Amino acid sequence: MLSKEPAEKMCSRSTGLDQEKVFSHKKLLSEASNEERSTTNSTIKKGIWYWNRASPPETRNSKLTMMLIDTHAHLDFPEFTEDLEDVLLRAKRTGVERIITIGINLKSSRKAIQFAERYPEIYASVGIHPNSASQEREDFLSELEELVKHPKVVAIGGTGLDYSRLPSKQESAEISQTTFGAADFHTIETEIRDEAEMAAQSAAFEQHLELAATVGKSIVIHQRDSWEDTIELLQKYSPRVRAVVHGFDAGPERAQELVDLGHFVSFSGNVTFINATEVREAAKSVSIDRIMVETDAPYFTPVPNRKKRCEPALVPGTAAFIATLRGMSLAAFAERTTRNAQRFFGLS
């Protein structure tokens, strides 16, 4: 059976690069060539320098003149229960004027709307995360159809396909920790459960796409180990929907595929990780008119704050890092990506 761990934990383990699996800076640099070490260190140092300028200390009362939008956060997760208002205040002080909080199931989506009603800077996206698809009730679409009518619901999702936690993957991981059998061993029964899980995710994803096309809202997509199937479904709906693949974790070729279909890519703090070479190449090359930035808070804290909880106030760090990669000023990059987010989510 699929894991019964909380949906928010499943989401954290399946968004982009698992934080647990990110190698240490020193280890990877020791294995890199001198040229690679020099280039990587230079980029990260520049990003940190810009981040320090872009992110004023909490004691500073004035906020930045630039405006940024955190296009993907999970403010309803337990990590923010105790200090959400402080989190929002810090975000404002760093120039993050708006935050899109993303539902991962019906309960989470309802809570996202409650936050959007309570706080003017918060907007909601409602949907069923792929890792929740087989656990959500079968008639979830009828409630989603009602939730999307709320004036502060600006998108549908997170939805998509995630093959990183299929039963066979979990079984292989368990076997690899024992002395019995090979890590890729799995049974026919497991294959059947894989197919059932993939079918549930695909059906839910297509229902979200159809709903987005019907109501005219953008769609927020989570993708993990499922590019071919994700692109195939997107191609079917691309003339009718506008999508963003959030927490982008692939290279420039995949980014260009999305842009060619008329969609967007959103980068989280994983672009700053030492082993995210392909992601950085995508961030450098993709059209500036198709980029957005996010935190995916509370996960994927950008360098140099890796040991801290991620929160919307850290968006300037990711924005500054990508701006440095592209040879842009932070102000210019913020202006362009904010404009993209406003257009995508229908914000004024």
Task: Give residue spans per PLM region.
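Leucine-biased recognition of intrinsically disordered, low-complexity hydrophobic segments
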Residues: L2, L17, L28-L29, L64
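Low-complexity, glycine/proline/serine-enriched flexible coil segments
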Residues: P6-A7
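Alpha-helix boundary/capping motif
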Residues: M10-C11, Q19-E20
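Intrinsic-disorder-associated, low-complexity terminal segments enriched in Asp/Asn/His/Tyr and depleted
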Residues: D18, H25, S38-N41, Y50-N52, ...
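Arg/Gly-rich low-complexity intrinsically disordered repeat tracts
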Residues: K27, N34-E36, N41, K45, ...
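Mid-domain alpha/beta scaffold segments of enzyme catalytic cores
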Residues: I44-K45, W49-W51, S62-S348
